[in-house]
Amino acid sequence: MKGNLDWQPTLINIEPEFANFVPTFRNGQIVRDLMPDQPAMTLNADFYFPEDRVVVELKCMETDSRDAYPERVARAFAHFGHTGSELMGFLFRGEPMPERVAGRIRQQIANPLRQALRKANRQIAATKHHLNIPDAFGLAVFANDNNFGLTPANALSILGNAALGLSNCHVDGFVYMTPNVYHHTGDDIARSVWVPLYSEGKESLADFVNSFGNAWIDYAEQFGEPYLERWKGDEYDVGLLTGKPIERFSRSRK
């Protein structure tokens, strides 16, 4: 959680910095370093924490779900046989979007996250097999790097529903974090999030994840000004989960 309206965010190069951070926390290891003889294209997760027996896969969300939105809407209207006049009615006359069209667009927005979670599940499973750690926890971390079309609640809903649909699930929990996307919640503070969810019966992973998140936030603080405040708790803040991403920060005139 960061500063006021005069503050400007410092963006983090997430993938390399997360890889730099991991060895500083509980002897975290880069999985590729543990498998030097495996072919370069071998499917594997990113990190392993042997002291906690946790395999972690990091996924960066670099594509904005709003990209090509008008074209997506037009195609969805046409897909269900709606006329050009009906499309114009939605775009320019304030007429409601047909539910079938809205459902198709929601599905298209959700698909990249669903696919990323399914791949993370395969990568975690492969890593547990390669390292012979069948009982290790699996954690998928989703870092929003450039997607200003999703609130935290949107992302958590998509990921939660996708996790329920995994077959042979190896993802015991996931984290949604927004190191490069900040949210407006009605005050003058731009806020980022680290929000975990766990599979039923895997809540014991929480101690690791909470410490992991605190350590990452400490590490990330070096890239900008100190955080004004931190909030943590067992209950999710509705205002934060529904906070709209801030695409542009204004600069004060002096």
Residues covered by each model-derived region:
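A generic structural signal for alpha->beta connector loops
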Residues: 27, 52, 170-172
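Metal-dependent nuclease catalytic core centered on acidic motifs
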Residues: 2-10, 17-21, 61-205, 222-254
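Active-site beta-strand-loop-beta-strand hairpin of nuclease catalytic cores
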Residues: 48-56
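Beta-rich catalytic cores
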Residues: 43
